[in-house]
């Protein structure tokens, strides 16, 4: 079943929520330190008439990595070409992309941690020396043909920075980790987005949606669209706190941003009474794949202290027992 709070993964040519995304830094809310540094680096690069150094964005899904890449393209007056690592299956696929770049272009690769080692090998000289090394033939007769590439900026995005190989990670001159948003920041984003949807969103309504959005802009914007539907059906031009609560309750998203899947996950861990449960066991119990659990369900729960991740598996924290209103033996949480 589809989850309204799920961070969906999209192919690069899909334009999910494009109309609601900011196109420049002036309209970009949150991630202030990253934004400040990027503005300086962009001004410096433009002053020297150079390409930006390669950039790596990491962090949970839905926080604005793709949006930042497009803003950088806009601010640099550069063309951006977008792809995702799973689409680059052979070294020839990457070679075709690189040889079609023009001077100053930006290449954005989403899910860059999923590049195969063979593809990474092709990328190294391209990033470092703007050169493509193509091997023709095999064995003693093999020859390497070197093709010069135009200078470009590679922007990589990943939800799993730890899965990047060290040689690839080290070739990014700028590395930024995006953090979860504060409710107040999300409320501002929602109020601005509502205007683009020809609605006015009351501040309290925006805060109500924000606190149920798992600190994630993409989820907040998705919830806003559904709340707008409830307002439209009731012929309301203003989204009120009452209407927002009604819509979100109807969607099954509680005050903490949890839906039925999150609650099932927490129930599974609390039933184990602080005994670690492995990822594969959790996936089997929830009928979900392991990647979805690690990339979609767990980041918010981990960041907010609802669960603990150990070498032996996942453990419910005290907050999980409180959320589910469960009685527990305080001895479960004694330091061992």
UniProtKB/Swiss-Prot annotation:
GO terms for cellular component: cytoplasm; Holliday junction resolvase complex. One of its GO terms (biological process) is DNA repair. InterPro entries: AAA+_ATPase, AAA_lid_4, DNA_helicase_Holl-junc_RuvB, P-loop_NTPase, RuvB-like_N, RuvB_C, WH-like_DNA-bd_sf, WH_DNA-bd_sf. The keyword Lyase does not apply. Gene3D superfamilies: 1.10.8.60, P-loop containing nucleotide triphosphate hydrolases (3.40.50.300), Winged helix-like DNA-binding domain superfamily/Winged helix DNA-binding domain (1.10.10.10). It catalyses: ATP + H2O = ADP + phosphate + H(+). Residues 1-181 are annotated as: Large ATPase domain (RuvB-L). Keywords: ATP-binding, Cytoplasm, DNA damage, DNA recombination, DNA repair, DNA-binding, Hydrolase, Nucleotide-binding. It is found in: Cytoplasm. This is Holliday junction branch migration complex subunit RuvB. It comes from Campylobacter lari (strain RM2100 / D67 / ATCC BAA-1060).
């Amino acid at each position: 079943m589809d989850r309204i709070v799920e961070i969906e993964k999209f192919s690069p040519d899909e334009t999910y929520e494009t109309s609601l995304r900011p196109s420049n830094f002036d309209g970009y809310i949150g991630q202030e330190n990253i934004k400040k540094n990027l503005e300086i680096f962009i001004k410096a690069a433009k002053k020297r008439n150079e390409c930006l150094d390669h950039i790596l964005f990491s962090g949970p899904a839905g926080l604005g990595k793709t949006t930042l890449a497009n803003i950088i393209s806009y601010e640099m007056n550069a063309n951006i070409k977008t792809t995702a690592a799973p689409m680059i299956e052979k070294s020839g696929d990457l070679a075709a992309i690189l040889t079609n770049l023009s001077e100053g272009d930006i290449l954005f690769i989403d899910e860059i941690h999923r590049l195969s080692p063979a593809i990474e090998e092709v990328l190294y000289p391209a990033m470092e020396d703007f050169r493509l090394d193509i091997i023709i033939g095999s064995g003693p007769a093999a020859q390497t043909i070197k093709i010069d590439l135009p200078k470009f900026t590679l922007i990589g995005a990943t939800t799993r920075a730890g899965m990047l190989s060290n040689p690839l990670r080290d070739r990014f001159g700028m590395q930024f980790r995006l953090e979860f948003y504060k409710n107040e920041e999300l409320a501002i984003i929602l109020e601005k987005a509502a205007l683009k949807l020809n609605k006015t969103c009351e501040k309290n309504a925006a805060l109500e949606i924000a606190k149920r959005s798992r600190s994630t802009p993409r989820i907040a914007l998705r919830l806003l669209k559904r709340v707008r539907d409830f307002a439209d059906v009731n012929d309301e031009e203003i989204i009120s706190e009452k209407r927002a609560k009604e819509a979100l309750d109807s969607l099954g998203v509680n005050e903490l941003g949890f839906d039925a899947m999150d609650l099932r996950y927490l129930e599974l861990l609390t039933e184990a009474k602080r005994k670690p449960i492995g990822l594969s066991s959790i996936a089997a119990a929830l009928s979900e794949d392991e990647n979805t659990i690690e990339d979609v369900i767990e980041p918010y729960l981990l960041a907010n202290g609802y669960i603990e991740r150990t070498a032996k598996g996942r453990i419910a924290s005290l907050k999980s027992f409180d959320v589910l209103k469960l009685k527990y033996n305080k001895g479960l949480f004694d330091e061992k």
